[in-house]
């Protein structure tokens, strides 16, 4: 029905604002027409000259059509309350030399003494479970408890982006599902890529933009595919609310640091012509051993450097000074000393490891990979030479990030057992046609996450092919051949922390790996545009404020009986709650919410038998605290998860494949031949026990399947791709 019948009646219509009398436009007079026959006069009723009070306006009736779409609505639960989670979150904590790392993957780690911590950017997925873990760390507060109501609905997020004292940063959020990360996700978190993206917020530091408000506000709606309906907390706790990417940046000096003369840097790489076999295995497929390769590399021209002068007392002939003439003329005697010291170093290392009880059954030590006289010893790879014209076993190149167009660059990882450095075979995590500083940004972290191998840093290496260096790090004859880059500390015989002490297990396994390549990758990443390369202090941390909005609902029990207030007990301190002062509101793990009692569980003022049985079946014992935790829920999982991994835990037991158990083998005893029936009975008993376990597993799986079917029919099912 139209709105004008209920409009308030006034004698004169009120005019708003300044107004003036409208001048009538000039009337257009048409030319005279031919006279026509006069119509017959008809008597008509005179029109009312005074407006009638009340309803007088007519409106046209619209034609009715059938609705093509229906709006489905859901009834609200009996109890519907607002839940707000407010807190402060450290999104970036960065130590010196951690520009390439993702803080989200290193937040749950404990660094060694003297090592840096954190990273310059983070990719964090916020869920109800992460909010609960932050609550345990006293980083947020909940406006009310979630223990008595099991239904929840998400309404949105408000952020406060606090400005840092001297560090700028960029914020980008994603609401697309599934909230997962891939091999190129860390490249998109680079500050240059984030500035060029469509949806980003740049937060300048107080040094970059003096004055103004100390924080910026950002309002983020719920995810795109999330429906506005009620979910159970147990299933909703793993749903991604927002995927937040935050990267520190330098807006004042984006292209070059103010305290250097050039943005270019020096990159050292292994010369594939001299190192024909880079495998760490004792020999290659052709049968040639590492002894032939080490004899080829150890020459007077390759080893005449400051490192040889430093250890001259261990390799010199008797009564000989360190001069070029003595070094070249008496090289045969020096070479013999080096070979003797190589064997004695291995013997002393084995004895020391045996005394300290560090030797294992598979502890293999190759003398060709020793620290002092091996294939990659500082005697061969020392970066400084007395004469630059000397032949070197490594290649030295200059790299300018401002000239890197990315076309032709290739970065990949490969195992240490591979003979050659090429991406034609056994190459993993290959990134092509991207600038070197962009491809290596967070590259090691995402590769370690995809590999899921604890020994990833010590069993793999990073290879690079780049035509934008001088000389070019590529091969003219083989298009798939690359180079293994080296850090200066590794070439000097030092560990990445620049400590002169090298662990015993590493002295017999001195070869380039990702553990030793982190420094050169850090240097390449720090040369890129907009990265924080000119820090004033050794560390920085960025904090944001968040306010998550939820609606929590369910059915509460009937209120308790009212007692006499004069007879209530007292306590020494009149503190409200009288319990944990740090957490006035009791918050439970959302994964375990949903087994509380409801009003329909009461029968004549007592709990029913079925409700007590449900509580006993679903109650879980308190799990012990695991430190350090294996996985952090705030770190987004990599792409490529199967359907079994996305489903609930109960349904996963039904979908997972059954592993074939190994055949039963009983240890030999003297009575085995005399009592074959006992062995047969034991085998049958174990087979029966295994069948019972499979039946219980199938029972849990079918139970979860039925629960999922009921939820889907009641429109309470949760999209597994939201998790």
Curated annotation (Swiss-Prot):
Pfam families assigned to the protein according to its UniProt record, in alphabetical order: TT_ORF1
Name of the protein this chain belongs to: Capsid protein
UniProt record similarity statement: Belongs to the anelloviridae capsid protein family.
Annotated keywords: Capsid protein, T=1 icosahedral capsid protein, Virion
Primary location group: virion
Role of this protein: Self assemble to form an icosahedral capsid.
A GO cellular component entry from the record: T=1 icosahedral viral capsid
Compartments, record wording: Virion
Top-level taxon in the UniProt lineage: Viruses
Keyword set includes Zinc-finger: no
Region (Disordered): 658-679
């Amino acid at each position: 029905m139209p709105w004008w019948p209920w409009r308030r009646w006034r004698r004169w219509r009120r005019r708003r604002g300044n107004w003036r009398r409208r001048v009538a436009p000039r009337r257009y007079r048409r030319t005279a027409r031919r006279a026509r026959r006069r119509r017959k006069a008809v008597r008509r009723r005179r029109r009312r000259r005074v407006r009638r009070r009340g309803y007088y306006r007519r409106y046209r009736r619209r034609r009715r059509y059938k609705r093509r779409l229906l709006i489905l609505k859901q009834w609200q639960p009996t109890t519907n309350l607002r839940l707000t989670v407010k807190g402060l979150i450290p999104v970036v904590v960065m130590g010196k030399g951690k520009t390439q790392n993702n803080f989200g993957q290193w937040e749950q780690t404990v660094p060694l003494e003297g090592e840096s911590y954190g990273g310059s950017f983070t990719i964090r997925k916020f869920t109800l479970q992460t909010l609960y873990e932050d609550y345990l760390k006293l980083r947020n507060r909940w406006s009310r408890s979630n223990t008595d109501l099991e239904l929840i609905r998400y309404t949105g997020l408000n952020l406060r982006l606090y400005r840092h004292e001297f560090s700028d940063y960029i914020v980008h959020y994603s609401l697309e599902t599934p909230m997962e990360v891939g091999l190129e996700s860390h490249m998109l978190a680079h500050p240059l890529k984030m500035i060029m993206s469509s949806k980003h917020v740049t937060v300048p530091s107080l040094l970059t933009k003096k004055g103004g408000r100390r924080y910026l506000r950002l309002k983020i709606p719920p995810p795109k595919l999330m429906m506005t309906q009620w979910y159970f907390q147990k299933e909703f706790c793993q749903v991604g609310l927002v995927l937040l990417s935050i990267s520190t940046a330098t807006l004042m000096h984006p292209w070059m640091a103010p305290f250097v003369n050039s943005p270019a840097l020096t990159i050292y790489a292994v010369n594939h012509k001299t190192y024909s076999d880079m495998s760490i295995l004792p020999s290659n497929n052709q049968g040639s051993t590492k002894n032939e390769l080490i004899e080829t590399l150890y020459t007077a021209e390759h080893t005449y450097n400051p490192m040889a002068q430093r250890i001259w007392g261990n390799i010199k002939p008797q009564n000989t000074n360190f001069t070029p003439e003595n070094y070249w003329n008496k090289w045969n005697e020096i070479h013999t000393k080096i070979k003797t010291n190589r064997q004695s170093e291995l013997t002393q290392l084995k004895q020391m490891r045996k005394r300290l009880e560090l030797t294992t059954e598979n502890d293999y030590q190759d003398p060709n990979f020793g620290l002092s006289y091996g294939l990659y010893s500082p005697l061969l790879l020392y970066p400084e030479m007395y004469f630059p014209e000397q032949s070197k076993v490594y290649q030295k190149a200059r790299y300018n990030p401002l000239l890197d167009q990315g076309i032709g660059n290739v970065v990949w990882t490969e195992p240490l057992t591979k003979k050659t450095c090429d991406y034609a075979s056994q190459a993993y995590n290959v990134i092509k046609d991207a600038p070197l500083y962009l491809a290596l940004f967070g590259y090691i972290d995402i590769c370690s996450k995809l590999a899921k191998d604890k020994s990833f840093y010590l069993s793999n290496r990073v290879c690079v092919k780049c035509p934008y260096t001088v000389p070019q790090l590529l091969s003219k004859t083989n298009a798939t051949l690359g180079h293994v880059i080296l850090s200066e500390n590794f070439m000097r015989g030092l560990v990445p922390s620049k400590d002169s002490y090298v662990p015993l297990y590493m002295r017999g396994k001195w070869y380039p790996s990702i553990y030793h390549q982190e420094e050169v990758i850090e240097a390449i990443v720090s040369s890129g545009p907009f990265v924080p390369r000119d820090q004033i202090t050794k560390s920085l941390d960025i904090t944001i404020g968040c306010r998550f909005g939820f609606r929590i609902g369910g059915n509460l029990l009937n209120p308790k009986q009212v007692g006499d207030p004069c007879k209530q007990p007292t306590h020494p301190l009149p503190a409200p709650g009288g319990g944990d002062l740090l957490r006035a509101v009791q918050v439970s793990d959302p994964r375990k919410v949903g087994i509380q009692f409801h009003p329909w569980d009461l029968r004549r003022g007592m709990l029913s038998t079925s409700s007590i049985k449900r509580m006993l079946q679903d109650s879980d014992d308190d799990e012990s605290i695991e430190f350090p935790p294996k996985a952090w829920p705030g770190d987004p999982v990599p792409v490529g998860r199967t359907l079994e991994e996305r489903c609930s835990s109960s349904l996963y037991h039904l979908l997972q494949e059954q592993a074939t158990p190994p055949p039963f083998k009983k240890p030999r005893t003297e009575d085995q031949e005399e009592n074959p029936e006992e062995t047969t009975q034991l085998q049958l008993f174990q087979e029966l026990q295994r069948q019972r376990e499979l039946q219980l597993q199938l029972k849990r799986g079918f139970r979860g399947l039925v629960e999922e079917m009921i939820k889907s029919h009641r429109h309470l099912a949760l999209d597994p791709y939201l998790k």
